[in-house]
């Protein structure tokens, strides 16, 4: 195994500890500390992940063309550390947005460089080890994420957000140091530009910043039903336009020669054909996988687990045995349940590699595309389980967390089939000089698009609930214009300046903001009684409602329908993939052994 691989693996372990630790507690932090509505929190977290997996496009170009992988990683890692620091020391929506923005730029910028750096350590002489190296790389991701996902919720619950965000920030600093120590161990693939890199970056940013600015403007001016979709289409269309104008108009004469040559290699000829072919597979099918998978990663699955109706006693079935009473009383935190995904990965990777794939190979040729197709069906099935859980919770029935763990088993099987396969597939299909870019433009951008779709759905499914008055006291009733089509257990969000305070956990007084549940429906008086979303207890409140300043909303996808929507969508995409995959022809690009430095 090449000597640089251990440094890459350790760096990835620490960086993923940081990213997944922070991501694991974001939804709980936003809903319980900042009092975001659940849909709003999902939108924010999805947009954060959108940025984290879109900015690899920028990092890949900077790496491939201007600075090379090492300088790009070290520079953007500092930006990453700054974002973590802002998040750990801040305390409101503004600092949250700034911290997440810097984190997205930093983690996104270094992501394609680190992962493709794995492949760069190999030649045609030892290419048979690439799959094993990528497995080690992926295992380091899941080991780091599993540890942080388990401990960060404990720190948030016991010590608050400063410690819970501060420890991952320290791990990111460690990741930067470890990567720096491996500098002399890496096989270095030089960037396209050997001179004038800073001038080239200036030209690059001159074209990029207007694209980002216009896309952000579109996001702000378009209504919530279509804003994410409109901004995404605008962003991708403008990027294509910039590339076209740069290659086919007089602008080509103003570009540095190395940048122009790189763009011609990336966007013309065989490379363009590869990108086009990969784009359909990744932007539609792999993107849908990530849309579903990321919701299990600290988002809607975690929010589901915050309900007290999910019994989170992991070993509760041992309660009748006196010797195991302490173990039976152990209760997981909602943000911790997702840790089983990483643990299942550690077990399933060797099982699939050495048992399941060989068995499958006796019946048919196990190709990357067939793995992906099977995985799409499998992950859709996991959402049927989660939908059933949500249906029980909505109707006030207790559900064991083991049902959600079962859903994670199914989801993790899909992840092994798709994620590792798609990562390796993207690298092997990419021409040599543009591997970082194609990794970003396919595998990582697919994650970004998947999260954009999640944000789009959660933004579009929110609908206003005209509210005339709110009666406060030991019970809180909201008088509405109409209670038609509302259900008991349905979520209802309060935002803006409601003028009302309520008593939360531990007797803390907070503004009436965030997600609540409809307890009872008084159809005769067109009013609903509010319950808190976690304990399902009556909301105790005081104050005078301000209808002109308050924002009261609910969701179009009620209860289990949210998860059934995604299950159906995933299943439909899986069926379509079966037909599309038959038209794709694979190629493999690796460095020739003769090109390896002495």
What residues fall within each predicted segment?
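Central cavity-lining transmembrane alpha-helices of secondary-active solute carriers
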Residues: 46-63, 146, 339-354
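Small/polar beta-strand repeat architecture
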Residues: 465-553
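Helix-loop boundary and gating motifs at the non-cytosolic
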Residues: 1-49, 281-284, 291-303
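Cytoplasmic membrane-interface "Motif A"-like loop-to-helix N-cap segments
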Residues: 65-77, 358-377, 433
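Intracellular loop-helix junctions on the cytosolic face of multi-pass helical membrane proteins
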Residues: 3, 124-125, 131, 153-331, ...
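Intracellular juxtamembrane helix-capping segments at the cytosolic ends
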Residues: 109-124, 415-430
């Amino acid at each position: 195994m090449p000597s640089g691989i251990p440094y890459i693996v350790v760096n990835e372990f620490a960086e993923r500890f940081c990213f997944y630790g922070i991501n694991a507690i974001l939804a709980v932090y936003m809903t319980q500390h900042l009092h975001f509505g659940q849909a709003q929190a999902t939108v924010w977290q999805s947009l954060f992940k959108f940025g984290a997996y879109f900015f690899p496009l920028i990092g890949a170009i900077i790496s491939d063309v201007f600075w090379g992988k090492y300088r790009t990683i070290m520079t953007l890692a500092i930006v990453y550390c700054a974002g973590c620091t802002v998040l750990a020391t801040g305390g409101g929506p503004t600092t949250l947005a700034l911290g997440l923005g810097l984190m997205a730029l930093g983690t996104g910028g270094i992501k394609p460089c680190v992962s493709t750096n794995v492949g760069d350590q190999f030649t045609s002489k030892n290419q048979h080890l690439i799959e094993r190296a990528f497995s080690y790389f992926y295992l380091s991701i899941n080991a780091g994420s599993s540890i942080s996902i388990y401990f960060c919720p404990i720190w948030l619950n016991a010590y608050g957000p400063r410690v819970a965000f501060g420890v991952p920030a320290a791990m990111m600093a460690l990741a930067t140091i470890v990567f720096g120590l491996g500098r002399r161990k890496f096989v270095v693939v030089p960037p396209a530009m050997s001179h004038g890199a800073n001038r080239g970056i200036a030209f690059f940013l001159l074209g990029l910043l207007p694209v980002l600015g216009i896309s952000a403007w579109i996001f702000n001016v378009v209504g919530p039903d279509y804003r994410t979709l409109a901004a995404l289409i605008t962003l991708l269309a403008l990027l294509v336009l910039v590339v076209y104008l740069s290659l086919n108009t007089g602008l080509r004469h103003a570009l540095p020669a190395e940048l122009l040559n790189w763009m011609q290699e990336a966007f013309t000829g065989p490379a363009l054909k590869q990108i086009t072919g990969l784009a359909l597979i990744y932007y539609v099918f792999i993107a849908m996988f990530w849309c579903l998978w990321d919701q299990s990663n600290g988002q809607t699955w975690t929010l589901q687990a915050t309900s007290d109706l999910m019994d989170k006693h992991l070993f509760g079935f041992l309660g009748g045995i006196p010797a195991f009473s302490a173990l039976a009383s152990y209760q997981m935190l909602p943000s911790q349940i997702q840790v089983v995904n990483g643990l299942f990965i550690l077990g399933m990777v060797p099982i699939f590699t050495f048992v399941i794939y060989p068995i499958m190979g006796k019946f048919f040729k196990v190709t990357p595309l067939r793995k992906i197709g099977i995985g799409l069906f499998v992950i859709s099935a996991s959402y049927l389980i989660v939908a059933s859980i949500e249906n029980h919770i909505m109707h006030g029935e207790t559900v064991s967390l083991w049902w959600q763990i079962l859903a994670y088993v199914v989801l993790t099987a899909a992840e092994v089939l798709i994620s590792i396969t798609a990562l390796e597939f993207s690298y092997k299909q990419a021409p040599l000089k543009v591997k970082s870019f194609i990794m970003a433009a396919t595998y990582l951008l697919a994650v970004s698009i998947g999260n954009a779709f999640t944000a789009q759905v959660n933004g579009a499914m929110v609908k206003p609930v005209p509210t005339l008055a709110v009666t406060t006291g030991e019970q809180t009733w909201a008088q509405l214009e109409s209670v038609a089509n509302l259900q008991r257990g349905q979520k209802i969000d309060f935002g803006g300046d409601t003028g009302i305070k309520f008593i939360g956990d531990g007797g803390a007084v907070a503004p009436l903001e965030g997600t609540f549940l409809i307890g009872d429906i008084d159809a005769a008086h067109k009013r609903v009684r509010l319950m808190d979303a976690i304990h399902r207890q009556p909301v105790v409140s005081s104050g005078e409602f301000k209808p002109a300043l308050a924002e009261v909303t609910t969701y179009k996808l009620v209860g289990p329908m949210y998860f059934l929507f995604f299950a159906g969508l995933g299943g439909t995409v899986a069926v379509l993939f079966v037909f599309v995959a038959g038209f794709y022809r694979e190629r493999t690009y690796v460095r020739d052994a003769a090109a390896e430095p002495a």
